[in-house]
């Protein structure tokens, strides 16, 4: 696991399994554009990363979302390192978390390959399908 956060409240921790072709990322209590950009920058620099890997985005710790609509559009359109056929599973439980995941799903215009789950186990199971 690569810890990309300076504090527990923000940042992210990601793990890449080239064997399983899955990237898992867990964000802290506060999610900002800087946190997402830091994760993407580290992922793009990782020589094991391939854009068609699957991804699990665990938002279960996020309590505060500090992303404007303009930031969300930029992240979805220009910063997102995954290709359109990659399966993406968001773990979200609260209204704030579900809103963040749903916003990305809408902006990427992909309800087939981007799904939202209440638990990590459900997300992992879907990626195995």
Whereabouts are the PLM-identified features?
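Amphipathic, Lys/Arg-enriched alpha-helical "gate/interface" segment within cytosolic domains
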Residues: 2-129
């Amino acid at each position: 696991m690569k810890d990309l956060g300076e504090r527990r409240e923000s940042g992210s921790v990601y793990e890449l399994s080239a064997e399983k072709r899955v990237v898992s990322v867990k964000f802290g209590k506060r999610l900002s554009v800087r946190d997402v950009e830091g994760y993407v920058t580290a992922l793009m620099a990782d020589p094991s990363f391939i854009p068609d890997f699957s991804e699990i985005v665990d938002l279960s710790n996020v309590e505060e979302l500090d992303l404007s609509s303009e930031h969300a559009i930029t992240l979805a359109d220009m910063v997102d390192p995954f290709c359109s056929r990659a399966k993406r599973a968001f773990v979200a439980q609260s209204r704030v978390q579900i809103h963040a995941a749903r916003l990305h799903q809408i902006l990427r215009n992909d309800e087939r390959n981007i799904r939202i789950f209440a638990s990590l186990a459900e997300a992992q199971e879907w990626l195995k399908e």
